Amino acid sequence: MADLVYPPVIAVVKGFWKYLGFQFDFQGDENIPRKGGAILAINHVSYLDFAIAGTGALPVKRFVRFMAKKELFDHKIAGPLLRGMHHINVDRNNGAPSYVAALKALKAGEIVGIFPEATISTSFEIKQLKSGALRLAVDAGVPIVPTIVWGGQRVSTKGIKPNFKRGKTPVSVTFGEPIHYAKDVDIETASQQLRQVMISMLNQVQEKYPDSHVG
């Protein structure tokens, strides 16, 4: 699909990161398929996670199509940008159209970004995962790449006044090994296993994080 909007938005986002002084650390980008469909299952700790995770995929020249809530698409400024970047509109009261759109994107060879916790974790721990990412992976026949973002919560997260002052905030994006699923996989069991993988990855990221506190 044509990407006329994504590149200029990326340029603006990179400028924003530079202004904030973000110090990025990308790990495991070799685990992102260079071609073909895949799902990034991303933890959710800040309002910046989608842009942070998308930035992490740029070194391998993949644009991520994020599943984002309808309210963002309804915004007069954000909406046209999201549609222009071919992100996927999620209406929580009617999820079928977004599922079909994500499935179509995956079968067309796109990378789809999903936050399986469905909301920001205010404890910064991995919440219970919704099953949608697993079901999509099975139906589309694509792998899930567990993805951990960390650091954005220090700038903008749920329930805390954002702090957009310039600084030197370490921000990391870690991509785990792709997980492939059989057609007859038990979704509930696989979801719990994916959560455990993400918990383990998050613990490792926190241990290596340059600051002593986790939040």
Describe the residue ranges of each PLM region:
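Helix-adjacent hinge/juxtasegments
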Residues: 86-110
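A charged, well-structured terminal subsegment
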Residues: 100-108, 171-203
